[in-house]
Amino acid sequence: MSEKSIVQEARDIQLAMELITLGARLQMLESETQLSRGRLIKLYKELRGSPPPKGMLPFSTDWFMTWEQNVHASMFCNAWQFLLKTGLCNGVDAVIKAYRLYLEQCPQAEEGPLLALTRAWTLVRFVESGLLQLSSCNCCGGNFITHAHQPVGSFACSLCQPPSRAVKRRKLSQNPADIIPQLLDEQRVQAV
């Protein structure tokens, strides 16, 4: 039986603390560290003040295909792939750094970010296993998450071709700078 390294255990505890702070679920912690389930639960309770949430991890690729989630997932995935390609980091460190970049760019709603860390980690696993990929939009040239084997040149992102329900959410003008004044005008008319 091999003896555990104290240095490796300290690294795992530090990594687990960072992941818990970012909102990781227990299954992600178990997969990325060598700490026991009992120690992870104890650490989670100590940092969060409550036990980790129960339940299964998201396992469907469909969540990443809906228009708003696709934009957020694509932003994260582009940052993650950039970090890997430049050799700045790899593995879970690349996921953490890409997720921090995503959080910097996307202001959080009260209920938290649209793309949670565990879902971002699941996205990485889907991309690495070949279930999802980044495809180039044939309109704007941006790279967006699509199902694997998307034919080249056949994809238009949800920013270039928003679904009708996205347009109903807010009336878009030809000039994006006009959106806020339009909303203010509508509110004034309704008030009168």
UniProtKB/Swiss-Prot annotation:
**Cofactor field:** Zn(2+)
Q: Does the keyword Metal-binding apply?
A: yes
Q: Which SUPFAM superfamilies match?
A: FlhC-like
Residues bearing O-UMP-serine? S31
Q: What is its main location?
A: cytoplasm
Q: Which domain of life is it from?
A: Bacteria
Record PTM text:
Can be UMPylated on Ser-31 by SelO/YdiU.
Q: Where does Zn(2+) bind?
A: C137, C140, C157, C160
Location comes to: Cytoplasm
GO MF terms here are: DNA binding; zinc ion binding
The reply to whether Nucleotide-binding figures as a keyword in the UniProt entry is: yes
Annotated Gene Ontology cellular component terms: cytoplasm; transcription regulator complex
Instruction: Paste the cofactor note.
Output: Binds 1 zinc ion per subunit.
Q: Which UniProt keywords apply?
A: Activator, Bacterial flagellum biogenesis, Cytoplasm, DNA-binding, Metal-binding, Nucleotide-binding, Phosphoprotein, Transcription, Transcription regulation, Zinc
What activity regulation does UniProt give? Answer: UMPylation of FlhC by SelO/YdiU inhibits its DNA-binding activity, which inhibits the expression of class II and class III flagellar genes, and interrupts flagellar synthesis.
Q: What is one Gene Ontology biological process annotated in the Swiss-Prot or TrEMBL record?
A: positive regulation of bacterial-type flagellum assembly
The UniProt induction remark is: Expression is regulated by a large number of systems, including induction by quorum sensing via the two-component regulatory system QseB/QseC, induction by cAMP-CRP, repression by high osmolarity via OmpR and repression by H-NS.
Q: Function of this protein?
A: Functions in complex with FlhD as a master transcriptional regulator that regulates transcription of several flagellar and non-flagellar operons by binding to their promoter region. Activates expression of class 2 flagellar genes, including fliA, which is a flagellum-specific sigma factor that turns on the class 3 genes. Also regulates genes whose products function in a variety of physiological pathways.
Quaternary structure, from the entry: Heterohexamer composed of two FlhC and four FlhD subunits. Each FlhC binds a FlhD dimer, forming a heterotrimer, and a hexamer assembles by dimerization of two heterotrimers.
Spell out the family assignment given in the record's similarity comment: Belongs to the FlhC family.
Q: What is this protein called?
A: Flagellar transcriptional regulator FlhC
Give the encoding gene's name.
Answer: flhC
